[in-house]
């Protein structure tokens, strides 16, 4: 983002570096999950669809009331704790590939987290309304602080952005634990060692997207803090 000199805006070379690093991280993680998913979407599991295996995992985890519904798009799969439903993309819901089963079971893992009262998921759920507010307002508050030269508003903007960083950090153990639960179920489901290994690769690639997102947020926050500190000392 542009930064405030006091009388106008200029382009900070450090910001360009931050943008480059964050862009590379994001693209690398996204390309890796796309290629890994594509590879293992061509390998059949034991014949059951992602929805079927997810249903069995849900029932085994005591999540009998959790529904499974379809959602448009690719890799748009998610668990919604508000309506207690898994939303699986068509390819993963009706597909019987290793990738489909891995993704579907990962989402079932989130439902199992809620059922077992997993603490970090409770923390993330509690942060959702806060982050929804702060991530939509921090840039406005920051610009107001810069234009009006009010340090308090700039500090508030950084605090708001910090909630997004915190959310990304809390998300990491939640996603890793959901994948752990998925792998544990897949291992005892009768799939071959090759298929289990493929599922692990898909879920590892997916986890790296969250790692990249967390690193990106941390880098952005550190840049903003350094920029604010430098301007405050002028």
Regions found by a protein language model. Give the residues of each.
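Core segments of transmembrane alpha-helices
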Residues: 133-143, 216
């Amino acid at each position: 983002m542009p930064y405030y000199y006091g009388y106008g805006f200029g382009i900070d070379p450090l910001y360009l570096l931050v943008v480059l690093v964050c862009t590379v991280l994001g693209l690398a993680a996204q390309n890796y999950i796309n290629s890994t998913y594509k590879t293992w979407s061509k390998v059949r599991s034991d014949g059951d669809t992602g929805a079927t295996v997810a249903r069995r995992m849900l029932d085994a985890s005591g999540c009998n009331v959790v529904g499974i519904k379809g959602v448009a798009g690719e890799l748009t799969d998610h668990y919604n704790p508000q309506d207690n439903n898994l939303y699986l993309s068509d390819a993963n819901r009706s597909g019987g590939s290793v990738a489909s089963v891995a993704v579907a079971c990962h989402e079932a893992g989130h439902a199992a987290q809620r059922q077992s009262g997993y603490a970090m998921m409770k923390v993330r759920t509690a942060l959702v309304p806060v982050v929804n507010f702060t991530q939509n307002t921090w840039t406005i508050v920051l610009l107001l602080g810069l234009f009006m030269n009010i340090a308090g508003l700039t500090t508030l903007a950084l605090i708001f952005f910090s909630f997004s960083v915190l959310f990304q950090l809390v998300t990491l153990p939640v996603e890793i634990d959901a994948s752990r639960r998925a792998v544990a179920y897949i291992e005892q489901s009768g799939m071959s060692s090759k298929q289990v290994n493929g599922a692990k690769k898909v879920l590892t690639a997916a986890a790296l997207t969250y790692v990249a997102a967390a690193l990106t947020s941390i880098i952005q926050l550190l840049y903003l803090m350094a920029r604010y500190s430098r301007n405050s000392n002028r």
